[in-house]
Amino acid sequence: MTKEFEFLKAELNSMKENHTWQDIKQLESMQGPSVTVNHQKVIQLSSNNYLGFTSHPRLINAAQEAVQQYGAGTGSVRTIAGTFTMHQELEKKLAAFKKTEAALVFQSGFTTNQGVLSSILSKEDIVISDELNHASIIDGIRLTKADKKVYQHVNMSDLERVLRKSMNYRMRLIVTDGVFSMDGNIAPLPDIVELAEKYDAFVMVDDAHASGVLGENGRGTVNHFGLDGRVHIQVGTLSKAIGVLGGYAAGSKVLIDYLRHKGRPFLFSTSHPPAVTAACMEAIDVLLEEPEHMERLWENTAYFKAMLVKMGLTLTKSETPILPILIGDEGVAKQFSDQLLSRGVFAQSIVFPTVAKGKARIRTIITAEHTKDELDQALDVIEKTAKELQLL
């Protein structure tokens, strides 16, 4: 037993040497613009809590009331005895919100992509994926028997090349993130849809980082570009801007009926507890009734980005509240993040394998809840630390 998992130890040691080992920070407070880490109050620049909904009073009240009325859990999978009225109400709300015929809720955004891709694709099909798509899309594709082609990131000429060479399939499915989580750029969805229609292909968009952020009342990239009704599959999370937990697929009634019968994560996982489901429903209502959250998000994003650019730091070509500061070296990125934390700013380094080797970064994410004072404090600390590390 002394040699058990020695091969894993060797890899872990290698990760530490190459600065790709991750120390998981523990929060000791509610998620928000400031949080407590290691008994220290710090400005939070690493969460996906874009609109501050994790602590919105309406969501908290909805969750508490649901627990009192329906209990802590559901006790079953959806297809046996775990579908409460509220689960179907949430799906109706999501379908209306995304302007589709129907929707289906999964346990997470990750399992949504796994469930959708693994169930609708066969060996007669081909899936065509952007090279920087999320890991859940990549893993979902691995679960299928379909052929796979990867096109260069947001390169429409390369996408068209792949489409031209893949004419002899039952279905060709183009899959893209709506917003790319590590760079913050938005997929050129109008061009993708135009090519799909030209070559008779299907389109699937993962709006994990766009729902609640882009489009009318946060409906996502499809709505942002005025493409409602022209994208076959929309997927996303209920855990980022929505502020709770889960994932969903939205599309035609035929698609959703099929996923309800074939989507394995949906079929074999216990349904969401009442508190989660009720809070998700309330979040959609808040998006529709309180547009000021999105307005503040974009005001804060514009200000923070302008200050980082003025400072002279190298950013990605972000178009969203995801504002990564490019570092390159993994060790320097980790050092930058650690020093920021010691000075009261929680901004995690992103290193391999989340991004390619040599492309480490500090990924800052701005939220609607940040005050100008908090943003200014964070900017001062970032500038001071960057100068010390000779990044400015």
Curated annotation (Swiss-Prot):
It catalyses: 6-carboxyhexanoyl-[ACP] + L-alanine + H(+) = (8S)-8-amino-7-oxononanoate + holo-[ACP] + CO2. The modification N6-(pyridoxal phosphate)lysine is found at residue 240. InterPro entries: Aminotrans_II_pyridoxalP_BS (IPR001917), Aminotransferase_I/II_large (IPR004839), AON_synthase_class-II (IPR050087), AONS_Archaea/Firmicutes (IPR010962), AONS_Archaea/Proteobacteria (IPR004723), PyrdxlP-dep_Trfase (IPR015424), PyrdxlP-dep_Trfase_major (IPR015421), PyrdxlP-dep_Trfase_small (IPR015422). Its EC number is 2.3.1.47. The keyword Transferase applies. Pyridoxal 5'-phosphate binds at residues 109-110, 181, 206-209, 237-240. Keywords: Acyltransferase, Biotin biosynthesis, Pyridoxal phosphate, Transferase. Transmembrane segments: none annotated. Substrate binds at residues 134, 354. Its cofactor is pyridoxal 5'-phosphate. Coiled coil: none annotated. GO terms for molecular function: 8-amino-7-oxononanoate synthase activity; glycine C-acetyltransferase activity; pyridoxal phosphate binding. Pathway: Cofactor biosynthesis; biotin biosynthesis. CDD domains: KBL_like. It comes from the Bacteria. One of its GO terms (biological process) is biotin biosynthetic process. Belongs to the class-II pyridoxal-phosphate-dependent aminotransferase family. BioF subfamily. Catalyzes the decarboxylative condensation of pimeloyl-[acyl-carrier protein] and L-alanine to produce 8-amino-7-oxononanoate (AON), [acyl-carrier protein], and carbon dioxide. Homodimer. NCBIfam families: bioF (TIGR00858), gly_Cac_T_rel (TIGR01825), PRK06939.1 (NF005394). This is 8-amino-7-oxononanoate synthase 1. The lineage of its organism: Bacteria, Bacillati, Bacillota, Bacilli, Bacillales.
